[in-house]
Amino acid sequence: MPYDAEILVVGCGNILFKDDGFGPEVIKALEEYFKDREKPDNVMFIDAGTGGPHFVFSLPHEEWKKMIVVDVVEFNAEPGTLRKFDVTEIPKGSYENMHTWPVSQPLHELSEKIDVVVIGCKPKEISAPNVEMGLTPPVKKAIPRAIQMILDEIGVSK
């Protein structure tokens, strides 16, 4: 499937490791939200799983104008707290995939070409390497607000 929309909403994370699955769960909730509503034609939702940094971020398309990355981010806040980050303010060392490859590098390069924002949720628990599926309660409760933040970013009123 070509990722050829103007606005991409990319959920990153691994559903096998508790709160690390926040991004994919938000994408699933967005798809559910738009089942009975008209989604803007210029917007695409992508569950990138753990492949976001390796594939989606490094394969820019000429159509792209904006990318909204949804993921867990370590920052000083209570679990379940959401924050919109500019790529330049992602705390160093706090936003890495399971192989400790810094995600900020391809995002910084991509942000030179298009508008990139990160909707970050403070995780309570990432269970890796132990497989434990399901979000913790505070992170699960953050999904509706994350959806509202994304709707605001793509210019859709609830």
UniProtKB/Swiss-Prot annotation:
It comes from the Archaea. One of its GO terms (biological process) is protein processing. Belongs to the peptidase A31 family. This is Coenzyme F420 hydrogenase subunit delta. CDD domains: H2MP_F420-Reduc. Keywords: Aspartyl protease, Hydrolase, Protease. InterPro entries: Pept_A31_F420-red_hyd_d, Pept_HybD-like_dom_sf, Peptidase_A31. The keyword Hydrolase applies. GO terms for molecular function: aspartic-type endopeptidase activity; enzyme activator activity. NCBIfam families: frhD (TIGR00130), hydrog_prot (TIGR00072). Does not copurify with the active FRH. Signal peptide: none annotated. The lineage of its organism: Archaea, Methanobacteriati, Methanobacteriota, Methanomada group, Methanobacteria.
